């Protein structure tokens, strides 16, 4: 890119999340940065938009997050308002994360982290979602350095200038020192078994309450999948698309007379 690229950064863990701050600091040398993130944690929000109430946007003044914007909405809300009026012009790249925990296989359908990158692609802007394979933040700076390398590669790649549908990448980073994060694998999504059963408890009022169970174990994690790459200690980079059409089944249904009239 001839001009300094404009990078929009969001997440689903909220604007105070350590993963967001680490990502922003890591990519600052790569371009002009705008941060618009949710006010609260919206993990599992997927591509939900807030339509039942107005949204408000506030700017952080002072501290290490000075200049960050936060929205009382979802990750998708954040990128949507940025693209449809809050920003004077569309950014060159949308990045999201770094998420606290992996987003692999079917996780991507539920993930607010992935959804923020997806929303950028909906507006023709390449998007990258970053997640770290850990529920803690003990190696978040290492993951951020690796994310910097992926963003730098994207900015000089033909993928960033592809005509037509913008590129969408889902990146999962092992919980390892940066020196060990030099191996990248381009992968496909693996597959999990169904989630664990809901956890049933009694509320103080004697009512049954239900907690969503833990993610299922890996069902299909063969070579070439995101699960396999992570198990091998590699960064997993999965190109994704918005078109959910099952094209082979579409052709089969047409061939078998499903078209009528």
Curated annotation (Swiss-Prot):
InterPro entries: SurE, SurE-like_Pase/nucleotidase, SurE-like_sf. It is found in: Cytoplasm. The keyword Ribonucleoprotein does not apply. Its cofactor is a divalent metal cation. Pfam families: SurE (PF01975). The keyword Nucleotide-binding applies. Its EC number is 3.1.3.5. Its main location: cytoplasm. A divalent metal cation binds at residues 12-13, 43, 99. It catalyses: a ribonucleoside 5'-phosphate + H2O = a ribonucleoside + phosphate. Keywords: Cytoplasm, Hydrolase, Metal-binding, Nucleotide-binding. Binds 1 divalent metal cation per subunit. GO terms for molecular function: 3'-nucleotidase activity; 5'-nucleotidase activity; exopolyphosphatase activity; metal ion binding; nucleotide binding. Transmembrane segments: none annotated. GO terms for cellular component: cytoplasm. Belongs to the SurE nucleotidase family. Nucleotidase that shows phosphatase activity on nucleoside 5'-monophosphates. This is 5'-nucleotidase SurE. It comes from Polynucleobacter asymbioticus (strain DSM 18221 / CIP 109841 / QLW-P1DMWA-1) (Polynucleobacter necessarius subsp. asymbioticus).
């Amino acid at each position: 890119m001839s001009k300094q690229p404009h990078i929009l950064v969001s997440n689903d863990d909220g604007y105070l999340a350590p993963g967001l701050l680490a990502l922003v600091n890591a990519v600052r040398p790569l371009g002009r940065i705008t941060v618009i993130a949710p006010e609260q944690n919206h993990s599992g929000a997927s591509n939900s938009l807030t339509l039942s109430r107005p949204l408000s946007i506030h700017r952080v003044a002072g501290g290490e997050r000075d200049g960050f914007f936060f929205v009382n909405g979802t990750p998708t809300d954040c990128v949507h308002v940025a693209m449809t009026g809050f920003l004077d012009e569309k950014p060159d790249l949308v990045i999201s994360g770094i998420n606290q925990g992996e987003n692999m296989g079917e996780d991507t359908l539920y993930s607010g982290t992935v959804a923020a990158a997806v929303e950028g692609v909906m507006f023709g802007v390449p998007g990258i979602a970053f997640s770290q394979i850990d529920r803690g933040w003990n190696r978040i700076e290492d993951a951020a350095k690796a994310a910097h390398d992926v963003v730098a590669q994207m900015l000089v790649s033909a993928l960033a200038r592809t005509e037509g549908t913008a590129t969408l990448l889902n990146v999962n980073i092992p919980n390892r020192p940066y020196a060990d994060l030099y191996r990248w694998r381009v992968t496909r999504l693996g597959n999990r078994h169904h989630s664990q059963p809901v956890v049933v408890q009694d509320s103080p009022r004697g009512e049954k309450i239900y907690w969503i169970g833990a993610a299922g174990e890996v069902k299909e994690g063969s070579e070439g999948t995101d699960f396999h790459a992570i198990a091998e200690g590699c960064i997993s980079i999965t190109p994704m698309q918005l078109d959910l059409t099952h094209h082979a089944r579409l052709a089969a249904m047409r061939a078998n007379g499903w078209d009528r009239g």
